[in-house]
Amino acid sequence: MARHKIVLIGSGYVGSAFAHAIVAKGLVDEMAIIDIDEDKAKADVWDLNHATPFGDNFVNVHVGQYEDFKDADIVVICASAKLAKGETRLKLLEDNVDIFVPMIQRIVDSGFDGYFVLPSNPVDIMSYVVKRVSNFPKNKIIGSGTSLDTARFQFFLSREFDVAPNQVYAPIIGEHGDSQVAVWSHAQIAGEPVLDLLPSNTNLEAFKTSISNRTTQIGYDIYVRKGTTNFGISLSLVRIVEAILFNKNIIMNVSSYVEGEYGLSDVYIGVPTVINRNGADRIIELALSKEELSQLHHSADIILDYQRQADAIIDQMC
């Protein structure tokens, strides 16, 4: 029976929540944890070890070393610069490129040949940075993309229609950020368009605007109150890791590298993607409305502009 090993880089709010979920579900045989704060990594390892008796399967959790990368199936990168007050996710770019370039080079030099999974913001651009620095094939690098935004969209719609969130299909695509696109043309419950399920006197545009704005804004609202968002995104990462390790063939809206899909090329962006043992196996092209497609292209233009800035920073470093 195949043994599964992951390395987690960054044991902050997101990383530790992810690690706890991995232990609770017993998804892997071994998990190595690396953090710039070695005492924090050590303390998390001890704490997680004491949780293993309650997990579904035993996970060997230990402090990671350079040697751990070589035989890992997946490296999950939760390391990130801190988001300063008033900054957007995209403003994190320069600091995180400075962190990522030497880190990715070292991981690749170790002989690692598995999959990179990351939520670090700006996640679409950082996914591109990992691809450029590692020179790995596109399927081996998966950013969390708009998976969390999609979950938020599902949740808000589920409250409106009094159904479980996982019974709502409502994709968010594009940038994980302000230019994200709510795909109302494909939002469904039990196969029925959600807009058709509303009372006949509903102001549809007002309803759509309200839900879309709440979906975009809620991350900032959470951040203002607790300084981070970590529970939803950590479970998104768990779902991605599980899909790769166990060939789940699930579809998630993650940061994938498009090469012609949706009329876009050479950009990491949130799109529906089949995830299995091949990583980001293939992109699903939804039939978007003209407005949605235009919004997606606008979102891609924003990401591409920052990708060019990332390229300039990398060129100076390498």
Swiss-Prot record:
Gene3D superfamilies hit by this protein = Lactate dehydrogenase/glycoside hydrolase, family 4, C-terminal, NAD(P)-binding Rossmann-like Domain
Positions bound to substrate: R89, N121, P122, V123, D124, D149, T150, A151, R152, T229
Listed name of the protein: L-lactate dehydrogenase
Taxonomic lineage: Bacteria, Bacillati, Bacillota, Bacilli, Bacillales
Which HAMAP family is this protein grouped with? Lactate_dehydrog
Question: Ion transport: present as a keyword of the record?
Answer: no
Q: Tell me, how does this one assemble?
A: Homotetramer.
Cite the annotated pathway. Answer: Fermentation; pyruvate fermentation to lactate; (S)-lactate from pyruvate: step 1/1
Database matches in InterPro entries: L-lactate/malate_DH, L-lactate_DH, L-lactate_DH_AS, Lactate/malate_DH_C, Lactate/malate_DH_N, Lactate_DH/Glyco_Ohase_4_C, NAD(P)-bd_dom_sf
A molecular function annotated in GO for this UniProt entry is: L-lactate dehydrogenase activity
SUPFAM superfamilies, A to Z = LDH C-terminal domain-like, NAD(P)-binding Rossmann-fold domains
EC number(s) given by UniProt? 1.1.1.27
